């Protein structure tokens, strides 16, 4: 062009003067920012939710079976892959968030889904330990591009007053297509255990291309400097969270519990399938096929957890949640510990699976109660800080606890590592019971003192 500017708004070299052009680093962002044909934001959100849920279920239903049977990872390597993923998400949350804060939520989401797809594809196609690590780093970085950006994008597009309805519908869409994806994973698993992982990667990359073509962004405004996530902000959150925890016992307990659960959970989540594969033959009902068996196991687990979540919200008396939440939460924590021990020690396949499902059900049952309990003890000015710190405590626990317990599983046995994990998590039961006793004593002394 005559003025030395590219039609997309990027400076080109001025041949007459030989001056240095502006770098082309904005070119990709500019291309991604403009859809070919804008679609309705709400419809786009539901479609991407459906496709992403389908792809995640495709990948994860048989992913750990694939890592063990096809890639040949030992218990330590399997846990290490998960730890690398957690560490990647933790470290890249802030730098990748700058794209959504400064440039475009749409661009951040598109980049994120594409990288997730690339990570899945690398792991599935190459099928080595190094590829599993690299693939999880890539898709972990991709996840941080979507984390927060997707919710912020749809909130910007439909408005805060309408977004609650959209999120409710999103949950239903996500559950439905997760079940569809689980069934599809089982079908593809009959072809080969790597097939659903590769298919998930291709689906995610196609989703990113589709979003580039139609995803609208009409209401984006850069986040003010003071509201952006930075490492300095994380440090401030840590200091503020610790200050709040010193003054409120219930906050201290939740931070401790999140850390302990993180320390114990990674080894169970990554190795219970290996324990089942090493110890038991697959039922003749499924033709002895591992892909079919673990697909059915996953579906049963999903339905059991859904039922437990509904039971928590609809059947548990409200007065229990309001006046004595520590009791059901402590019982749920106890059930989780018992479930881990059961998987480690029981010699019957269906009893071991029942322990897996019981643990998942206990987590689903207690999650809304814990959320209500913690939020009730926070004011608006500190809620986001404490909730973020609570999540970070769990992530730190997973990164710190996963490798040692994985190494223990490799050097001794998986049952030994699971029992140790249960011992690590056991104090959470006492912690919740202690809060309950303290709260009861406090309320009996003076009604004017807030009951935790």
Question: Which functions belong to the PLM regions below?
Answer:
Residues 21-39, 216-255, 451-452:
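Juxtamembrane intracellular "pre-TM" segments in multi-pass secondary transporters
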Residues 114-127, 334-347:
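C-terminal ends and interior cores of transmembrane alpha-helices
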Residues 195-213, 416-434:
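Symmetry-related core transmembrane helices of the 12-TM Major Facilitator Superfamily/SLC fold
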């Amino acid at each position: 062009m005559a003025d030395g500017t590219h039609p997309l708004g990027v400076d080109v070299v001025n041949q007459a003067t030989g001056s240095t052009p502006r770098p082309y680093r904005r070119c990709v962002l500019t291309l991604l920012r403009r859809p070919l044909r804008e679609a309705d934001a709400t419809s786009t959100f539901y479609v991407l939710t459906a496709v992403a849920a389908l792809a995640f279920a495709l990948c994860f239903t048989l992913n750990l079976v694939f890592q063990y049977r096809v890639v040949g990872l030992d218990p330590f390597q399997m846990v290490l892959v998960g730890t690398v993923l957690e560490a990647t998400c933790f470290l890249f949350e802030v730098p990748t968030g700058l794209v959504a804060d400064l440039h475009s939520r749409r661009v951040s989401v598109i980049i994120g889904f594409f990288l997730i797809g690339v990570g899945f594809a690398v792991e599935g196609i190459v099928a080595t330990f190094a590829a599993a690590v690299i693939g999880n780093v890539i898709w972990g970085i991709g996840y941080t591009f979507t984390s927060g950006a997707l919710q912020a994008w749809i909130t910007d597009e439909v408005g805060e007053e309408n977004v609650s309805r959209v999120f409710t519908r999103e949950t239903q869409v996500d559950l439905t297509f997760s079940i569809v994806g689980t069934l599809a994973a089982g079908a593809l698993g009959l072809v080969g255990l790597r097939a659903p992982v590769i298919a998930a990667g291709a689906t995610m990359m196609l989703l990113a291309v589709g979003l580039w073509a139609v995803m609208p962004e009409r209401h984006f405004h850069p986040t003010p400097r003071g509201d952006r996530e930075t490492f300095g902000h994380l440090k401030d959150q840590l200091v503020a969270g610790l200050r709040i925890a010193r003054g409120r016992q219930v906050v201290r307990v939740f931070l401790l519990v999140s850390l302990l659960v993180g320390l114990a959970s990674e080894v169970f989540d990554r190795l219970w399938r290996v324990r089942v594969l090493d110890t038991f033959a697959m039922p003749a009902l499924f033709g002895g096929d591992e892909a079919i068996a673990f697909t059915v196991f996953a579906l049963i687990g999903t339905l059991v957890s859904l039922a437990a979540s509904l039971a928590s919200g609809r059947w548990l008396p409200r007065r229990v949640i309001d006046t004595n939440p520590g009791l059901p939460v402590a019982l749920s924590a106890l059930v989780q510990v018992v479930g881990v021990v059961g998987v480690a020690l029981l010699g019957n396949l269906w009893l071991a699976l029942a322990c897996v499902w019981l643990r998942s059900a206990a987590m689903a049952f207690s999650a809304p109660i814990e959320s209500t309990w913690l939020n009730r003890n926070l004011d608006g000015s500190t809620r986001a800080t404490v909730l973020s710190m609570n999540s970070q405590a769990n992530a730190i626990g997973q990164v710190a606890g996963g490798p040692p317990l994985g190494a223990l599983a490799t050097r001794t046995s998986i049952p030994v590592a699971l029992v140790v994990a249960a011992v690590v998590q056991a104090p959470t039961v006492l912690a919740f019971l202690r809060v309950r006793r303290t709260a009861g004593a406090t309320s009996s002394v003076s009604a004017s003192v807030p009951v935790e």
